[in-house]
């Protein structure tokens, strides 16, 4: 837990398609009614995939996106520290079709609450130290796979074959090597995915308590 009281940082980790984005958006939408639209923000770890614009498309698709080395956690840590110090940051935008950052960024101003969501957040001790609370979405892998196939085919322009190949070669092995072991660092473990109403209410109450402390 961070000792900095200027903003509350909540990290939500777990397997790909485990419900991280859903629970993050639900908490965001429900909390902003209480703390104000401009006092809560969401940062997606995917935005901090390393810039690969110097690589060919053939090289980019070979990147293991489920390994910590694929992410620029240095920049993410720097941005969180800037936000905690009261400074705005420029969050990178990432293209899933081009497999690299775009030339665009999104300005994020300091908030009372920052919700982080991403598969590998809890693997980095620097990020864990900045969090006031951490969550792990403990969704069964077979459910995650079904969701991932649907999402990647419908939203990210992938084919069924490429999604399954990536799952077998990198997604599942990296989950077992990095993501599953990081569960031990979570303050709260959420079963049954992002529609777990009890878990959402507990998280909202915990964040509200942190805001008052």
UniProtKB/Swiss-Prot annotation:
One of its GO terms (molecular function) is uridine kinase activity. Coiled coil: none annotated. It catalyses: uridine + ATP = UMP + ADP + H(+); cytidine + ATP = CMP + ADP + H(+). GO terms for cellular component: cytoplasm. Its EC number is 2.7.1.48. ATP binds at residues 14-21. It is found in: Cytoplasm. Pathway: Pyrimidine metabolism; CTP biosynthesis via salvage pathway; CTP from cytidine: step 1/3; Pyrimidine metabolism; UMP biosynthesis via salvage pathway; UMP from uridine: step 1/1. Keywords: ATP-binding, Cytoplasm, Kinase, Nucleotide-binding, Transferase. The keyword Iron does not apply. Its main location: cytoplasm. InterPro entries: P-loop_NTPase, PRK/URK, Uridine_kinase, Uridine_kinase-like. GO terms for biological process: CTP salvage; UMP salvage. The keyword Ion transport does not apply. HAMAP family: Uridine_kinase. Belongs to the uridine kinase family. NCBIfam families: PRK05480.1, udk. This is Uridine kinase.
């Amino acid at each position: 837990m961070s000792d900095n009281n200027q903003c509350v940082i909540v990290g939500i980790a777990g397997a790909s398609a485990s419900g991280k984005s859903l629970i993050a958006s639900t908490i965001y939408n429900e909390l902003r009614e209480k703390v104000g639209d401009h006092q809560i923000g969401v940062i997606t770890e995917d935005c901090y995939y390393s810039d690969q614009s110097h690589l060919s498309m053939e090289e980019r698709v070979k990147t293991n996106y489920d390994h910590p080395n694929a992410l620029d956690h240095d920049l993410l840590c720097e941005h969180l520290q800037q936000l905690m110090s009261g400074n705005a940051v420029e969050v990178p935008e990432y293209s899933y079709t081009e497999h690299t950052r775009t030339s665009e960024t999104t300005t994020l101003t300091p908030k009372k609450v920052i919700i982080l969501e991403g598969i590998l957040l809890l693997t980095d001790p620097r990020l864990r130290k900045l969090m006031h609370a951490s969550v792990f979405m403990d969704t069964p892998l077979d459910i995650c796979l079904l969701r991932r196939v649907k999402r990647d085919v419908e939203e990210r322009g992938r084919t069924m074959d490429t999604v399954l190949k990536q799952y077998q070669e990198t997604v599942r092995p990296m989950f077992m090597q990095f993501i599953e072991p990081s569960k031990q660092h979570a303050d709260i473990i959420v079963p049954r995915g992002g529609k777990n109403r009890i878990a959402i209410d507990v998280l909202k109450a915990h964040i509200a308590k942190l805001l008052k402390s």
